[in-house]
Regions:
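A feature for loop-to-transmembrane-helix boundaries and adjacent hydrophobic helices
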Residues: 1-223
Length: 224
């Protein structure tokens, strides 16, 4: 059977490969920033508060995501640690990015005298949507798949053929946990936006708490 394997390289720029992973991750971040800036204005902050935070948060999130990934895949780097600095092929962990970005957010809001909880409420729906988008970067990189399964099981889910084909990793089919998480996070985005539109029912920080609860249920199912 001929499998339709996706190419992780989108195109080459002056001979340098540009990966779908990077394009998708950056697209998710850009959308999250835009949505957060609109919400910031709605609650009385400035767009610049969001854009300025990105100068703090984005580097911290990237470093956190990389360190988290390397820490749990150290056997891949122990013999060639210089590879730690190369991320074009992927190797970023969402959880580490959230930790790094969260630390940056704490110090940024203290510096700007902005409520940390308000900022978290602003960001939470956008972040979970960016995570939903980012999981497709993992798919293009042949990452974030789950336990072994059968092709028949995947076909019974009525998934598109290109997804089924690309869940064949080294001859074994796997659960598309990237897809499960992506769909779950899109639903989470909708729920959090609806909650945010009911401020009289919620206290400061409870939209963010909703994000934590929603995403925790996702991890219970998709994490090994």
């Amino acid at each position: 059977m001929m499998l339709a394997q996706v190419n992780s390289i989108a195109f080459r720029l002056f001979g340098i490969p540009v990966y779908w992973y990077a394009i998708i991750i950056v697209s998710g971040i850009a959308l999250a920033v835009w949505l957060s800036s609109r919400e910031a204005v709605r609650v009385g902050l400035k767009e610049d508060d969001v854009f300025d935070f990105m100068l703090w948060g984005l580097p911290a999130a990237i470093v956190g995501a990389r360190l988290y990934y390397v820490a749990f895949q150290w056997q891949d780097y122990v013999d060639n640690p210089i590879e730690i600095f190369f991320t074009r092929n992927g190797g970023l962990a969402i959880y580490g990015g959230l930790i790094g970005g969260g630390l940056a957010l704490f110090f940024f809001t203290r510096h700007r005298f902005i409520s940390t909880w308000t900022f978290l409420d602003i960001a939470a729906p956008s972040v979970i949507l960016a995570q939903a988008i980012g999981r497709w970067g993992n798919f293009m990189n042949h990452e974030a798949y789950g336990p072994a399964t059968t092709r028949q099981f995947l076909e019974n889910l009525h998934l598109p053929t290109f997804i089924i084909d690309n869940m064949n990793i080294n001859g074994t089919y796997h659960q598309p946990t990237f897809l499960y998480e992506s769909v779950w996070n899109v639903l989470g985005f909708i729920v959090l936006v609806l909650l945010r539109k009911k401020p009289h029912f919620l206290k400061e920080g409870e939209v963010f708490l909703g994000y934590i609860i929603w995403y925790s249920f996702c991890l219970l199912y998709t994490s090994p």
